[in-house]
Amino acid sequence: MAIIHPKVRGFICTTTHPKGCELNVRDQIEATRKLGVREDGPKKVLVIGASSGYGLAARITAAFGFKADTLGVFFEKPGTETKAGTAGWYNAAAFDKFAKAEGLYSKSINGDAFSDEARAKVIELIKNEMGGKVDLVIYSLASPVRKLPQTGEVIRSALKPIGQPYKSTAIDTNKDTIIEASIEPATEQEIADTVTVMGGQDWQLWIDALAGANVLAEGARTVAFSYIGSDITWPIYWHGALGQAKQDLDETALRLNQKLAGEVKGGANVAVLKSVVTQASSAIPVMPLYLSMVFKIMQEKGVHEGTQDQLDRMYRDRMYRTDGAPAEVDEKGRLRLDDWELRDDVQNACKALWPQVTTENLFELTDYAGYKKQFLNLFGFERADVDYDKDVATDVKFDCVEL
C-alpha cells in the first residue's frame, strides 16, 4: 500500500497510480461497448505490445467490441507491496480483470517481446489454450532498444533528423515555456540502428515464427502501427531516422501481405494512426507543442479522437466492415486513420498558429493544459474520481506468465 502522487522527470512520469490506471481502462472499455458488440470480426487475437497506448486499445476493441479471446505480450515492471509498478502493468491487470468478468479468455506474457523465448511461449499458449490458431496479430511495439535474438547485441534507436540539424520551436514541458530546440542529425550508423529497432525486422520474425508453427488461421491478418504526420513534424519524424524505420515497416508489410495471401488467404497492412499523447510520443521533441495545437483545432472542428476512438474506427470502418468490402488503403497498401488529422483545414490552421505561440499565450492559443492532463492520465493521475491522498494497493497480481 502507498499514497502516490505524480513525479515527472523530463518526459517520463516516474510514479503510477494503480486505481487511476484501472479506471482509465474501464473508461476505454465503456467507450468501445457503446458502439455495440459485433460477432463478425476477429475471434482469437495476439497483441504484441499490449499494455498501453494503441496496443492496449487494439486489445480492448478486440475483446469488448468483438468478444475475442486475447493474448497480450509486453515488458512491464510489476508492483510490489511497497512500490508501484509501471502503468502498463496496471493497465494489463485491469484489462485481464474486466475480460475475465465478461467470460473472455485473457492471458498475458511479461517479457522481452523481441526475444525468441517470447515467440516460443506465445506459440505454446496458442496451441494449448486458444484452440490452436489466431486470426489477428497486432504489432504495436514502441521501444528505444532491441536486443537481437541471434547475438544478444543491444541496439538503440535515435530520434534525430537526417542531413542537417533540426531547429524548431518546442515546449520545455518541465517549465511550461517555449524554447528553440536544436537536434543534430543522425549518423549513418544511428539511422541503420533505428531501422533495426523500429523497422519491420521483428514483425517479420514474429509472423514467420507463427506461420512456421502453423498457428495462423485461414484468413489471418496482421497489422503494424505507424505514424507519418504532416510536414510540420517531418524533419524529425518521417524524413528523420524514425521515418526510415517506418518505411522499412511499409516494405515488410508488402512482403508479409504476399506471404499470408499465399499461405492462409490472409493479409498484412501497416495502419497509419493519428498523433496522440502516449509515453512514446512525449519523447519526440516538438510533438508536445504540435499535439497541443492539433488537439485544440481538431476539437473545435469536432474531429478529435483518442487512442480508443482510432482503434474502434480501424476495426469497424476499415478491417471488419459490416458490408464485407475490403478495407480502403492508400497507394502503399496502408490503412489510413490519420485522415482527419491530415485534412488541409486542420494542417493549415496548425501552420498559421505555430509562429504565434509564445510562453505567455501557450495555454490560451493551444490545448497545452489538455496535453498535460492527458500525459498525467497515462500514469493514472488527474482523475476527478480518485482520491490521491488515500492509500492504494500496489501489489496487483493477474494471469500473467513472467519470462
From Swiss-Prot:
One of its GO terms (molecular function) is enoyl-[acyl-carrier-protein] reductase (NADH) activity. Keywords: Fatty acid biosynthesis, Fatty acid metabolism, Lipid biosynthesis, Lipid metabolism, NAD, Oxidoreductase. Transmembrane segments: none annotated. It is an enzyme of class 1 (oxidoreductase). The active site is at Y237. It catalyses: a 2,3-saturated acyl-[ACP] + NAD(+) = a (2E)-enoyl-[ACP] + NADH + H(+). Substrate binds at Y227. Its EC number is 1.3.1.9. NAD(+) binds at residues 49-54, 75-76, 112-113, 141-142, 246, 276-278. The record marks E76 as: Plays an important role in discriminating NADH against NADPH. NCBIfam families: EnoyACPredFabV, PRK13656.1. Belongs to the TER reductase family. Monomer. Involved in the final reduction of the elongation cycle of fatty acid synthesis (FAS II). Catalyzes the reduction of a carbon-carbon double bond in an enoyl moiety that is covalently linked to an acyl carrier protein (ACP). This is Enoyl-[acyl-carrier-protein] reductase [NADH]. It comes from Pseudomonas putida (strain ATCC 47054 / DSM 6125 / CFBP 8728 / NCIMB 11950 / KT2440).
